[in-house]
């Protein structure tokens, strides 16, 4: 049985993330979406809120689970007996970053294999950070994040969207 981990801060989860999760879930027996802390960013949502938002969006994927995780990704992977790390690539800048992370992870744990999925064109040009910036200005971001997530995002930012 192949268990994989798809880690991220998911602040918030995007349609691009969800596309990667759906695609990765078809490649492995068990996929764990690991909601992790990004120490270089100040999160908008708590870990508990992010786990709940993501779980709500993944009800149709029986081999996918969502877990909060702290510390090194390789340590979390060892704790859940995962050997495959799934990452997404939007552009060439992502490739360089992900290559370096893959090499570091491999040096920390030889059993880890990293699989990179290329973002599909509709999702290749935005990130959670960019979506938050646009949402702060009051723009509707529901084409980038699920509707329920967009509502929570606007509520948190004080930029509620009215129909």
UniProtKB/Swiss-Prot annotation:
Q: Which UniProt keywords apply?
A: ATP-binding, Coenzyme A biosynthesis, Cytoplasm, Magnesium, Nucleotide-binding, Nucleotidyltransferase, Transferase
Cofactor(s) listed:
Mg(2+)
Annotated Gene Ontology cellular component terms: cytoplasm
Which Gene3D superfamilies does UniProt cross-reference here?
HUPs
Query: Could you tell me where this protein is found in the cell?
Result: Cytoplasm
Question: Which residues does the annotation say bind ATP?
Answer: 9-10, 17, 88-90, 98, 123-129
> Does Nucleotidyltransferase show up as a keyword for this record?
yes
* UniProt: substrate binding residues: 9, 41, 73, 87
Under the heading InterPro entries, the entry gives:
Cyt_trans-like, PPAT, Rossmann-like_a/b/a_fold
What is the catalytic activity of this protein?
(R)-4'-phosphopantetheine + ATP + H(+) = 3'-dephospho-CoA + diphosphate
Output the Gene Ontology terms for molecular function: ATP binding; pantetheine-phosphate adenylyltransferase activity
Signal peptide segment: none
Pfam families for the chain: CTP_transf_like
Residues carrying the site annotation Transition state stabilizer: 17
Q: In which pathway does it act?
A: Cofactor biosynthesis; coenzyme A biosynthesis; CoA from (R)-pantothenate: step 4/5
Family, as annotated: Belongs to the bacterial CoaD family.
Any idea what job this protein has?
Reversibly transfers an adenylyl group from ATP to 4'-phosphopantetheine, yielding dephospho-CoA (dPCoA) and pyrophosphate.
The record's note on quaternary structure and interaction partners says:
Homohexamer.
Q: What is this protein called?
A: Phosphopantetheine adenylyltransferase
* Species per Swiss-Prot/TrEMBL record: Lactiplantibacillus plantarum (strain ATCC BAA-793 / NCIMB 8826 / WCFS1)
What phylogenetic lineage does the species belong to?
Bacteria, Bacillati, Bacillota, Bacilli, Lactobacillales
